[in-house]
Amino acid sequence: MPKTFYLTTAIDYTNGAPHIGHAYEKILADVIARYHRLKGEEVFYLTGVDQHGQKVQQSAEKAGIAPQQFVDEITAKFIALWDKLDVRYDRWAATTDPVHKTCVQGILQRLYDEKQIYKDKQEGYYSVRQEQFLTDKERDPDGEFGPEWGQVEHRTEENYYFKLEPHKEWLLGYLRAHPDCVTPDFRQTELINADEKLSGDLCISRPKSRLSWGIELLFDSAYVTYVWFDALTNYISFVGYDPSISSFSLQPSTFQEKWPALHIIGKDILIPAHGIYWPIMLHALGFPDEQMPKFLVHGWWNISGAKMSKSLGNVIDPDSLADKYGAEALRYYLMSDIVTGKDSDFEERRLIELYNSDLANSLGNLLNRTLSMAGKYRNGQVLGPGRLNPEPGMAEGERWNLGQQLNVVSGLAVVANKEASGAGFDIHDVIGVLNHWTTQCNTLVEVAAPWKLVKDDSRASDLNAVLYCLAESLRIIAILILPALPKAAHGIFDQLNWKMEPELAGKEARFSLADAEWGKLPDGHIVGKPTPLFPRIETSPEG
């Protein structure tokens, strides 16, 4: 059976409403998942919420409600937003789910039985915000703990620890032998440097005396699981991992069909959680090297180069943006105006500019003028593919320009198809090629001047060639832009009157990368009438 392409995002902490960073990551994963489905692959996309931990418990207490009610209310906001933004996932991961709880408890019990977890006393400074003890490495040059740690207090506490150091050399060797483990590659270098400095073990418990909202340890009911150990395990708990089976090769087939995963995460949670703790946890559970996950590490959306934060009051709300401009406008901006793996500045003005220039003025205009001309000049028929009239109906230079532009446009089908076929993570590159193609199609209209060709019967073949070239370009562009703009892709197909079978309406099965080959639009195809697909976003003179 073919291997499933399994991808995950970080699960979002339910102590507050979703922000633009959450939306970017989930849309990025959604677009990557849709590209793989477009190629005919089986895809499993997992996302969800992290519902345990001290911050959740404190927020619930502040709100005067039970933790479960609090996380349920926050979770509903995330689910509603992903639905609004057309994020299509295959499984929802909530860490209060009994399936997850059972898996976490089973993993911890097994590691405890294998002496990989031990109990010890720790004394030192504790970050309430980050829910961890701090060491001198976390102090700034002045010897103080920075504001990122929030409230810091001195504590003495007994807890359970997971052994990290015995796996340090293995992880170093693995990372050096697998240079493609982390994308972009400079993040892998950072991870290796961090692993070289690794010391100490990981505290994986919290006493119930100060934190009751968590998954209880089976071997000591006075403790709950540390939120990071709990959260990381979701990547295997929701796809059928059985912690009672120590051999990976004996795991259920439903799990082995999916694993290993591609983890799509922000740069702030690669080190140490995902890049060090998680591989070591898997190694301790007996996962072989070839079954280690890969990581796509994305950057942040900033405001004027500074990180968004609640304290600065500059957090961007994706829900209100989607209401204001539409989900497709937001999806397009977030995918086109950032290089995957790097940071970018969020500007509402840029969102409007890119939508109006790339979609309303370029792609939308191309669709409108193509269908209008086909309707006006050929009663909606696309006759072709046609050829240039060999008779001297125009000046040699003019004829060469038209032929050249036709070749440019049809040739871009190969370029765009190749770009999308190999689409890994550089979504903005694919969008850039499609934008260039659309621009060249609009240039073809200006070069060919169909309104002149229709007046000369000897130029009928030229007109047919131009209209076919435009309609066929739109058909293929719709296929390739589907992952980023699913609703727009369906809209283009609808107006082209293409694949209109009722059972395909609104479904991804309507699109296939195999169909994105030049020449599949049949001679005599009847297109529909144009309706505005991308209404311009009008701004005030001051805006």
PLM-predicted stretches and their roles:
Residues 2-40, 44-47, 99-103, 147-376, ...:
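Structured secondary-structure scaffolds
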Residues 339-350, 355, 373-431:
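Long, amphipathic alpha-helical stalk/connector segments used for oligomerization, subunit docking
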